[in-house]
């Protein structure tokens, strides 16, 4: 009986230690991030390799895969096996980028497009019309970004 109790006590200590190590290292930082981004702890997120695309490039049309108009610095092409279409994504590395209208990017993108080369943990960010539109986002090309699903949208993404 004592051996069983000792084994049970040891098991509970090991279990508690494993759960403690799984807890967040920075709960206050996690809370601040969730308030700033609107995402809840445990929201699905992915580390993705980014590429850029623009109108005028081969194979790029004026409409996304939903039939909606592509929106500069908002439309993201994704692999729907990884990230579902109609997902609102927060990409923290894009916060502060210059938008086509001169405003500052808030980090929100709309997963409304797909691409033949977008497979797995890749994301293609639409920058606008012409190769010059890629300049503000050039540093993101081939970079590893963090995309977090923070919601879903209906219809077409806002312009």
Located regions from the model:
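Bacterial N-terminal signal peptides that target proteins for export
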Residues: 1-6
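Solvent-exposed, well-ordered loop and adjacent helix/strand elements within mature globular domains
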Residues: 23-159
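Sec/Tat signal peptide C-region and signal peptidase I cleavage site
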Residues: 18-22
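Bacterial N-terminal signal peptides
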Residues: 8-16
């Amino acid at each position: 009986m004592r051996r069983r109790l000792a084994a049970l006590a040891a098991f509970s200590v090991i279990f508690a230690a494993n759960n403690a190590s799984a807890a967040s290292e920075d709960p206050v930082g996690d809370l601040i991030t969730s308030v700033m981004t609107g995402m809840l702890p445990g929201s699905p997120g992915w580390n993705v390799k980014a590429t850029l695309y623009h109108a005028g490039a081969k194979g790029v049309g004026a409409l996304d895969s939903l039939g909606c108009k592509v929106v500069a610095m908002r439309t993201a092409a994704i692999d729907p096996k990884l990230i579902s279409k109609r997902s609102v994504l927060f990409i923290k590395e894009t916060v502060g980028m210059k938008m086509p209208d001169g405003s500052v990017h808030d980090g929100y993108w709309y997963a409304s497009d797909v691409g033949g080369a977008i497979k797995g943990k890749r994301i293609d960010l639409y920058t606008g019309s012409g190769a010059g539109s890629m300049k503000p986002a050039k540093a993101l090309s081939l970079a590893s970004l963090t995309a977090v699903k923070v919601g879903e949208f209906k219809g077409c993404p806002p312009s």
